[in-house]
Amino acid sequence: MDYIIEVLPFMLDGFRTTLWVFAITAIFSIPLGIIVCLMRLSKIRIINFLTQVYILIMRGTPLLLQITFIFFGLPIVGIVLNRELATAVAFILNYAAYFAEIFRGGINSIDKGQFEAAKVLKLSKSTTYFGIILPQVFKTVFPSLGNELITLVKDT
């Protein structure tokens, strides 16, 4: 019992850190994932290509390697981040790539008639995506987002 009382403050501190990293990552990576998704769906080839490369790198390399690169690699080029910020940036960039692919799958699952109807009504692309498409996408991708958020808790 004495041992439990002795280590409890350290466990609570670790729990606080886990919650902080989870909250910061969820708050920033989901909107960034939507932006990256829309860039991935762009008709501008260079934006589409660069976004594909970003997603490929982020999803294809281990998260620990990305954290190490951001914490130890960026100071080589003069960008120094403290360990909490480096961890948060790595998590945000990593999970934004995963969320982007989830949202892209959700957008691709929407019937093309929705896009055509918005075009006939002469709605702008931003109104089409943010007013018509994304609300439907959230309903579709909600289970996948939940799974990814559970993975985020485990990763932190």
Regions found by a protein language model. Give the residues of each.
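Transmembrane alpha-helices and adjacent helix-loop boundaries
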Residues: 1-156
